[in-house]
Amino acid sequence: MQKSCEENEGKPQNMPKAEEDRPLEDVPQEAEGNPQPSEEGVSQEAEGNPRGGPNQPGQGFKEDTPVRHLDPEEMIRGVDELERLREEIRRVRNKFVMMHWKQRHSRSRPYPVCFRP
């Protein structure tokens, strides 16, 4: 039976039940896939950090590694080593380029070259 207009007045028709009115079975269980809200009430996935680690990418790394101060001499040695490695890479690259060029432009081809007059 429908209620009269006076009884329905002021009450929304599709109002969800309050939490205390619901039976215990309807309350969702917090388990497997439900993200836990953080202290501010915003889920960690909404923050953009699904793993729940430190918010700043380098924050945990800074705590784990000791602070290392380099001497100017040690920095110069590192730069010298990088320059040496770059020169070695340059030499090897040039070597392979020359080998490739020689193979493509050699006169002893496995097949005869026909020139048209």
Curated annotation (Swiss-Prot):
Subcellular locations according to the entry: Nucleus
Domain of life: Eukaryota
Keywords: Coiled coil, Nucleus, Transcription, Transcription regulation
Coiled-coil region: 73-100
Disordered: annotated segments: 1-75
Cellular component terms (Gene Ontology): nucleus
Function summary: May be involved in transcriptional regulation.
Name used for this protein in its record: Transcription elongation factor A protein-like 8
Recorded name of the encoding gene: TCEAL8
